[in-house]
């Protein structure tokens, strides 16, 4: 929701934003340059207010007060923002754009619902407001069509929609940024008296007349004059079959024809012509008729609800030539579905059969069609394991979304939406800004007397306060839990518009009549309570459950403002030195740990990981991902210690003594070379894609890269599609199709072995290198027995690729050589390059890593470690297994280990007692269970045993950390500890003297 004003005849540009990813953060980085060029980048707060501000920008010169001849503006927002802006869109479009201004609305559509609560198609909202729609195919056309859109807006007096989708707007591509590469001319169109642009004094009836009688036709005329729609393949002298598509579907169509082996020369022979539409509404029907004149069959390739097909059929309805039009249906049977989205393989299958029916079924086409049909079967591969998004390590929502037993809660828009799959009695949500208003309608008819409603500070600021006011007016019993995490976390961690802070939220809630407002805060953060009214009740976050139990009994609307900074934003700020970084780390002594999982229950933290020991599965802290929230320490377990002065230990890079590494034979590119990068959100996967694309640019190759993540930045699955070509024009759709992957850089075994990735692989074509480390999923926080079936996942990849897949533990290798698992993806990348899987030069990759600018030296080292690891796998294995405990290989070794353990625990006599008892069951099916169970009975961990086991804590710490270590034990001795309000013993801190 921001708005944009640039200069032409002393024009100014204004940009008002909605949350279209990182546009605003990028704009903020170049604020000086924008200011120098009269570009105003301005918060819009929410989408409809942003659009209203742009409406105002078109009026700047109407009263003779304008500082510039005109202002041209850009609004950008996702589909939900388009929907909520419908009223202002109609008003502003009826009023019109200014003569030297113009407005473009970039609408981010999510056809597949990967990062939205509904599957969005905004086209019909635009059409309903009579706003023309441009549909760019690729990054270059976003620039070109944006410029065209402003020119069209000025000429026609209409606002103009620019449809952007994941395949275009979330893609990386090499483009020509010179705006002089495109130019536009005005058609000889006769306008009414007074023109088509905005007027100071105007009447609704007159506005409608201009819109219906002139403006829409002016848009068609402008499209024809500037050839926005183009015939790409002419199809010879007398083409009979024509394919029509626009935007993302145009890229899909080009790709699908390639899959069928049809090139432009074949199209001439077969009489196939293609038509690329740029302005999808209103369609330039005169240009279309000229193209379609000789055709017998027109196939409209279009996903979702049909826009082009309807216009084409309406135009051809009275046509006597009898041309057939296939689109959503073919002779009454579904062809291109209105559900979900289309992909090149699906399109290739459908049009392949059509061409065969139309007599174009050459041996080559039929052979390729057979392959396409069979490759689609791979998409039905069953999932062995999956990785869903989850709260980050140390995320405030880990604590804030917990509710007392007997209560229930609603989710909403934001990261807390994920609480719905975390067993937190949280189900149901609304659109942004409606949080809690659903309860107004449900409450009178429900036996439930009270609910909690989660809402983030970004949503509150955007529109959520209106829902709270509505709840106050209705006097329903609801407690709003407002997380103030100081960041709009879902869209990149931006700050709240208008400088909103927690004290203002509390003051506003009191002012609108919320009956009780309390503040719960993270005691580790420096909250300035001088800004709050002294009467406000404040509690540390450990009291949250008790606060909720009390407040749910309040009548009417109440609120808890929960203050804790977003974990991802904390991490970013700490790297920049702008947030306190406690000199403290959490460590679990695995000898003391019993693997009960209560630490995961208390913290819901994905930095708690499993570790196999001789005595079973225990817990450990992943120091690389830990965000120092320390909630895990509350687990009812004496194994936790915190340590100050600790620096993560890693072997110095030189200790590996890398030999001089030979250069690999790089693969040749035939058409395109397709690379898939997989991994876990937040672990640097996107960085690898960015480096690849930049290296290709440095090597003078074409490159297209697209991130397919959705909520994956929150710990879910990430897929990066990267296509390389010797010539940029050889790249159509960036999304790699089924069976088309040449190389897989597998940063995570779960994601790489998933059906979405495996379907892209083809034996004899695809090579893969995969990180074999068990990167746990969020499921482990709730299920103590959860494990990732690594062996089965590896087998599934080997079944598909045979010997063309390699595995090694890049995570542990990164930790032990570079001190942080974040470099594991770069290590896998280095291995893939050394194995001859990446058609880019070493020099270009090195330069791309340097240009990326993030931890340059360590990333370069990681790349070299990866090269070394694939050439010297035995030596690499010795490194990454150096801290792995050698487990007993059979039952007799397990019994022997437990015998030794009992001697250390107490005495030889106790050990003999154990052996004597177990021997009674030797050779029976009970022997294994008795050997483990009886040992647990004898080696009971009382206070004395815990103390004995903690005597080796310092040596265990020395294995993982360097520095002058100051240890604190976190214990709840039965005699000394008190019970908290939640009935759990309160842990106390004890120094090393213990």
Each predicted region: which residue ranges?
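Single conserved hydrophobic/aromatic residue that forms the stacking wall/gate
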Residues: 1-12, 16
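Thiamine diphosphate
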Residues: 20-154, 165, 401-402, 408-490, ...
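Active-site cofactor/cluster-binding pocket
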Residues: 82-84, 500-503, 508, 516, ...
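Conserved thiamine diphosphate
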Residues: 109-159, 165, 190-199, 203-204, ...
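Peripheral docking tails and interdomain loops at the edges
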Residues: 140, 302-388, 521-549, 558-562, ...
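Conformationally flexible catalytic loops at phosphate/diphosphate-handling active centers
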Residues: 156-235
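Iron-sulfur cluster-binding cysteine motifs and their immediate structural context
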Residues: 564-565, 569-576, 594-651
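Small-residue-enriched alpha-helical segments and adjacent helix-cap loops
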Residues: 893-994
């Amino acid at each position: 929701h921001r708005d944009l004003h640039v200069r032409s005849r002393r024009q100014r540009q204004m940009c008002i934003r909605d949350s279209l990813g990182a546009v605003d953060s990028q704009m903020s980085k170049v604020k000086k340059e924008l200011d120098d060029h009269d570009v105003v980048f301005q918060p819009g707060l929410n989408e409809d207010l942003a659009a209203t501000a742009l409406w105002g920008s078109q009026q700047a010169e109407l009263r003779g007060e304008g500082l510039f001849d005109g202002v041209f503006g850009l609004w950008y927002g996702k589909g939900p923002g388009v929907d909520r802006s419908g009223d202002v869109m109609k008003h502003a479009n009826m009023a019109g754009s200014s003569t030297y201004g113009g407005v473009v609305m970039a609408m981010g559509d999510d056809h597949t619902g990967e990062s939205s609560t509904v599957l969005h198609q905004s086209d019909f909202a635009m059409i309903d407001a009579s706003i023309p729609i441009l549909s760019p195919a690729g990054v270059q056309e976003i620039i070109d069509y944006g410029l065209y859109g402003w020119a069209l807006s000025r000429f026609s007096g209409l606002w103009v929609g620019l449809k952007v989708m994941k395949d275009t707007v979330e893609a990386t591509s090499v483009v020509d940024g010179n705006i002089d590469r495109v130019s536009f001319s005005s058609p000889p169109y006769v306008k009414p008296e007074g023109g088509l642009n905005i007027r100071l004094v105007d009447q609704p009836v007159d506005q409608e007349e201009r819109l219906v009688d002139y403006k829409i036709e002016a848009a068609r005329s402008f499209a024809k004059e500037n050839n926005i729609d183009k015939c790409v393949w002419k199809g010879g002298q007398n083409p009979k079959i024509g394919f029509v598509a626009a935007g993302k579907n145009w890229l899909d169509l080009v790709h699908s024809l390639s899959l069928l082996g049809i090139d432009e020369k074949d199209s001439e022979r077969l009489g196939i012509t293609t038509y690329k539409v740029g302005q999808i509404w209103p369609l330039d029907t005169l240009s279309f008729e000229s193209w379609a004149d000789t055709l017998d069959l027109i196939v409209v390739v279009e996903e979702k609800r049909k826009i082009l097909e309807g216009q084409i059929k309406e135009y051809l309805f009275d046509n006597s030539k009898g041309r057939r039009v296939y689109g959503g249906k073919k002779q009454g049977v579904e062809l291109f579905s209105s559900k979900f989205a289309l992909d090149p393989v699906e399109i290739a299958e459908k049009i392949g059969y059509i061409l065969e029916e139309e007599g174009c079924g050459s041996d080559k086409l039929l052979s390729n069609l057979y392959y396409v049909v069979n490759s689609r079967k791979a998409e039905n591969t069953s999932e062995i394991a999956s990785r869903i998004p989850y709260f980050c390590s140390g995320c405030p929502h880990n604590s804030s979304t917990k509710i007392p037993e007997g209560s229930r809660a609603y989710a909403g828009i934001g990261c807390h939406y994920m609480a719905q799959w975390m067993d937190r009695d949280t189900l149901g949500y609304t659109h942004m800004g409606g949080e809690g208003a659903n309860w107004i309608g449900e409450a009178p008819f429900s036996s439930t007397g009270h609910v909690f409603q989660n809402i983030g500070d970004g949503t509150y600021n955007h529109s959520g306060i209106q829902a709270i006011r509505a709840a106050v007016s209705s006097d329903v019993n609801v407690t709003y839990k407002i997380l103030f995490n100081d960041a709009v976390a879902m869209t990149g961690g931006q700050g709240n518009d208008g400088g909103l802070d927690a004290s203002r939220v509390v003051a506003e809630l009191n002012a609108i009549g919320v009956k009780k407002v309390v503040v719960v805060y993270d005691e580790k953060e420096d909250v300035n309570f001088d800004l709050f009214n002294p009467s406000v009740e404040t509690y540390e976050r450990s009291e949250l459950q008790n606060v909720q139990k009390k407040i749910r009994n309040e009548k009417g609307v109440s609120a808890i403002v929960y203050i804790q900074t977003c974990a991802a934003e904390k991490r970013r700020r700490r790297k920049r030195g702008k947030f306190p970084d406690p000199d403290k780390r959490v460590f679990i002594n695995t000898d003391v740990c019993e693997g009960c999982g209560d630490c995961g229950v208390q913290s819901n933290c994905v930095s708690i990981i499993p570790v196999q020991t001789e005595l079973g599965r225990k817990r450990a802290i992943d120091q690389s991902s830990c965000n120092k929230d320390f909630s895990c320490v509350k687990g009812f377990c004496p194994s936790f210690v915190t340590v100050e002065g600790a620096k993560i230990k890693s072997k110095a890079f030189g200790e590996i003594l890398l030999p001089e590494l030979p250069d690999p034979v790089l693969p040749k590119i035939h058409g395109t070379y397709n690379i898939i990068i997989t991994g876990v959100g937040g672990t640097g996967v996107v960085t690898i894609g960015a480096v690849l694309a930049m290296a290709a640019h440095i090597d003078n190759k074409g490159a297209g890269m697209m991130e397919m993540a959705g909520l994956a930045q929150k710990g879910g699955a990430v897929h990066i599609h990267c296509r390389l070509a010797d010539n940029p024009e050889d790249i159509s759709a960036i999304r790699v199709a089924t069976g088309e992957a040449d190389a897989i850089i597998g940063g995570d075994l779960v994601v790489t072995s998933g059906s979405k990735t495996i379907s892209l692989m083809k034996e004899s074509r695809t090579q893969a290198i995969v990180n074999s480390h068990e990167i746990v999923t969020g499921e482990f926080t709730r299920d103590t027995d959860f494990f990732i079936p690594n062996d089965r996942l590896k087998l599934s990849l080997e079944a598909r690729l045979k010997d063309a897949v390699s595995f090694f533990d890049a995570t542990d290798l990164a930790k032990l050589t570079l001190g942080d698992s974040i470099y594991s993806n770069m290590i896998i990348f280095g291995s893939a390059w050394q194995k001859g899987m990446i058609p880019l030069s070493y020099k270009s990759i090195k330069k791309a890593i340097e240009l990326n600018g993030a931890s340059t030296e360590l990333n370069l080292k990681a790349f070299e470690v990866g090269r070394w690891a694939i050439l010297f796998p035995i030596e690499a294995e010795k490194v990454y297994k150096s801290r792995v405990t050698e487990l007993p290989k059979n039952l007799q070794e397990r019994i022997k280990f437990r015998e030794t353990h009992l001697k250390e625990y107490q005495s030889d006599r106790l050990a003999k007692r154990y052996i004597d008892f177990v021997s009674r069951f030797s050779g029976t099916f009970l022997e294994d269970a008795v050997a483990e169970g009886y040992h647990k009975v004898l080696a009971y961990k009382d206070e004395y045993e815990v103390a004995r086991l903690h005597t080796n804590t310092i040596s265990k710490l020395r294995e993982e950390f360097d520095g002058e270590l100051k240890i604190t034990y976190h214990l709840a001795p039965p005699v000394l500890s008190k019970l908290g309000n939640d009935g759990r013993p309160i842990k106390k801190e004890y120094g090393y003297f213990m």
